[in-house]
């Protein structure tokens, strides 16, 4: 299993434990997080470089909320290269926030940037659907309940790629907004789009 944009590797590590995988999943991320999961083989590299060099093939290649960080040409290259690295019956699964229905709690600047990012995601999905007409599309809705204190910590750690380019002052100002805008407990629906490309 290969996880592109694995972050700290917690999701793929949990999946690995639940599915009792024979091999440790490989996680790629351009951010070298300190608190990475020990249950994955972490590589601090970009996907295009890794895929073009690796001799490994995979049953599953997971691309989570990362596609918007690439240019259209890079997406075409990445998906084509990923498809060539799939085992028989292998799958590429692209997970991203639903670009049309999004309830993530945000501060003003975060919302503005997220909206721009999701708009771009929609154009990317259209491109992927055009290039892979047999693609399977699924939607998932997760009910999220989280304390405001915990959510503030997540924002401080820049849990979503939209926050990565923000400076310390922008984050600090945003946290003041979050503190004033939301109740002690945040409840929202996390809506994900899942695109599945089969080998």
Model-derived features: positions:
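Class I SAM-dependent methyltransferase SAM/SAH-binding core
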Residues: 2, 7-50
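Short alpha-helix
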Residues: 118-132
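Conserved class I S-adenosyl-L-methionine
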Residues: 93-119
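Short amphipathic alpha-helix with an adjacent loop that forms part of the alpha/beta core around
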Residues: 50-56
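A short glycine-rich, Lys/Arg-flanked "PGG" loop and its adjoining helix->strand segment in the class I
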Residues: 76-88
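A conserved beta-strand element that flanks and buttresses the S-adenosyl-L-methionine
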Residues: 62
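Short catalytic micro-motifs in class I SAM-dependent methyltransferases
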Residues: 65-66
């Amino acid at each position: 299993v290969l996880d592109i944009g694995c972050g700290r590797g917690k999701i793929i590590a949990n999946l690995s434990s639940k599915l009792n995988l024979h091999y440790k999943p490989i996680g790629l991320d351009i951010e070298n997080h300190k608190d990475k999961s020990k249950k994955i083989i972490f590589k601090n590299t970009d996907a295009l470089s890794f895929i073009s060099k690796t001799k490994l093939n995979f049953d599953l290649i997971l691309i989570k909320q990362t596609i918007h960080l690439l240019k259209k040409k890079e997406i075409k290259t990445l998906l084509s290269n990923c498809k060539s690295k799939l085992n028989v019956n292998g799958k590429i699964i692209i997970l991203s926030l639903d670009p049309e229905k999004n309830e993530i709690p945000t501060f003003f600047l975060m919302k503005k940037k997220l909206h721009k990012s999701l708009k771009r995601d929609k154009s990317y999905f259209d491109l992927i659907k055009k290039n892979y007409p047999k693609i399977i599309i699924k939607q998932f809705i997760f009910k999220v309940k989280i304390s405001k204190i915990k959510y503030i910590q997540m924002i401080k750690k820049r849990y979503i790629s939209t926050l990565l380019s923000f400076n310390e002052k922008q984050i600090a100002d945003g946290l003041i907004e979050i503190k004033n805008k939301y109740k002690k407990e945040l409840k929202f629906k996390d809506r994900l789009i899942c695109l599945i490309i089969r080998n």
